[in-house]
Design a protein with these regions (language model features):
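Short proline/glycine- and polar residue-rich coil/turn motifs
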Residues: 135-140
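Small/flexible residues
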Residues: 20, 34, 122-125
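Disordered, acidic Ser/Thr/Pro-rich linker "stalks" and the adjacent N-terminal cap
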Residues: 1, 24-92
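Aromatic, loop-rich ligand-recognition surfaces of beta-strand-rich domains
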Residues: 67-130, 142-188
Length: 188
């Protein structure tokens, strides 16, 4: 038994490291795709798109503004103790971009995740008048992917319902709606 466990662990590590390398290679190949017609056109690569500005229906204070949603840090946006009620987040981009998907991240830190309100049902609209997506988010602190597949210069996210914060180790839940990050992926 003392010999079998290390062998299994070593084999698992070797297998996982090889699979990860293959996935990275496949992603690199996909990012380099070209479309051939009567002329050859190189497709622009899918990449993160960063807003030039944002607006929130409310902020807890300037330290919890909507700019925190795209700063690639653990800082969060929080509403002004409204429990996600009537929450609207609007993002403006410098140009019209074809957005394939967005990734929403609730608070990664367990205590913040548990004690804060989190968006549950959301509606996403854009400056394209007929575009709308509704999605129920999971009540977890993993990244959640939402397909968009639309051109837009502005994206608006409305919170329609929320998961309430919970008590943790005798500490009362917070009344603020919180979100850590929103990443936008598209082609310009």
């Amino acid at each position: 038994l003392a010999l079998i466990v290390p062998l299994i662990a070593g084999a698992s590590f070797f297998y996982n490291s090889r699979v990860a390398d293959e996935v990275i290679e496949e992603i690199a190949v996909i990012e380099q795709t070209t479309i051939t017609s009567t002329s050859t056109t190189v497709q622009s690569n899918l990449k993160p798109q960063v807003p030039i500005s944002c607006k929130a229906s409310s902020n807890f204070n300037e330290d919890f503004s909507c700019e925190n949603l795209y700063d690639e840090s653990n800082s969060m946006w929080q509403d002004n103790s409204l429990g996600c009620e009537d929450t609207v987040l609007e993002f403006t981009f410098s140009d019209t971009i074809y957005f394939e998907f967005i990734v929403i991240q609730n608070a990664e830190k367990s205590s913040s995740f548990i004690r804060n309100f989190k968006a549950r049902d959301i509606r996403i609209t854009t400056d394209q008048s007929d575009y709308q997506v509704e999605k129920e988010l999971e009540n977890d602190n993993f990244q959640q992917w939402i397909d968009l597949n639309t051109d837009a210069n502005n994206i608006k996210i409305e919170v329609l319902s929320a998961y309430p914060g919970e008590e943790l180790n005798g500490q009362n839940p917070f009344t603020e709606c919180a979100m850590q990050e929103i990443k936008f992926f598209g082609k310009s």
